[in-house]
Structure formats: structure tokens, C-alpha cells
Amino acid sequence: MEKPQIELPVGPAPEDLVISDIIVGEGAEARPGGEVEVHYVGVDFETGEEFDSSWDRGQTSQFPLNGLIAGWQEGIPGMKVGGRRQLTIPPEAAYGPEGSGHPLSGRTLVFIIDLISA
């Protein structure tokens, strides 16, 4: 798959995690707390500015779900290898409220994630 273009949702930022399957995979299913390998791109909901992309680094990222932001811990399980999913994550499920010490705290984030292995 190629790097996706994110189409930002219209309207105000959601207060809860929004999960949207773009492509439903047919491979192994990601499990809560399991290890995953993904390609992803993330943008700021308000500005549309891209802040991170494994695609731009030219390599996938692999990590245990329990070490990630809550929005990923909740939004990736159930996804199947080969799938592409968009997560719209409010601050509370990302890096916390504004002033929490992370450059993205207080921001609603939008990610498109391709599940490579689970």
C-alpha cells in the first residue's frame, strides 16, 4: 500500500475515539496488549498539519500496544493484517489536556494505520 492521504472529518472535533475502517484486512487479528507492526501517518485535527509518519521514514514501526497512547490501545485491537483504519483521537486518549508536557497535548489527532503484522 502507498502512503495514505488523510481526509479530515468535517465539523467539531469529536469528544470520543472514532474508529473508521478504510480497508478491512483478512489476516491475523490484533489483540489487546499484543505486539503489532504498522505503517502510519498522523495529523492534527484542527490544522491538518502532519506531525509523524512511518512512511516518511521509509520503514514500518513495531511495538507492544500496551506501550502506546490509549487511542491506539483501544483503536487497533480487532483490526486484521492487511487492513487500513482511521482513528480520530481526542486529547484524553492521546497526550492529555493542554499543558500536559507533550507538544501534542490538548490536540485531537487523526491517524491512518496500516496493520502489517499482529
Swiss-Prot record:
Q: Which residues form the PPIase FKBP-type domain?
A: 33-118
Concerning InterPro entries, the annotation shows: PPIase_dom_sf, PPIase_FKBP_dom
- Annotated Pfam families: FKBP_C
UniProt superkingdom: Bacteria
Q: What is its EC number?
A: 5.2.1.8
Reactions listed under catalytic activity: [protein]-peptidylproline (omega=180) = [protein]-peptidylproline (omega=0)
Major enzyme class = isomerase
Q: Which keywords has UniProt assigned to this entry?
A: Isomerase, Rotamase
| One Gene Ontology term of the molecular function aspect | peptidyl-prolyl cis-trans isomerase activity
Q: What does this protein do?
A: PPIases accelerate the folding of proteins.
Q: Which family does it belong to?
A: Belongs to the FKBP-type PPIase family.
Q: What is this protein called?
A: Probable FK506-binding protein
Specify the species. Corynebacterium glutamicum (strain ATCC 13032 / DSM 20300 / JCM 1318 / BCRC 11384 / CCUG 27702 / LMG 3730 / NBRC 12168 / NCIMB 10025 / NRRL B-2784 / 534)
